């Protein structure tokens, strides 16, 4: 099972629902338009990209989320997501 390395170096099992939940929160706080299909699609794409890895860092996942939001023309959501990420890293 894919392991995620958190900021405190703890390892946890990969859970794509955490990714989609974070995206949905960013959508609500960014554009105010919540699009569950886009959030689920991004989470699934990241899961597929990481499938062959044994571990991935939370910062790598966050970068992938941000890039995919931009690619899917979700700029306001990406900005809200990036703001949340900056606070967490601080």
What are the functions of these language-model segments?
Residues 1-90:
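Long, C-terminal-biased catalytic regions of enzyme "large/alpha" subunits
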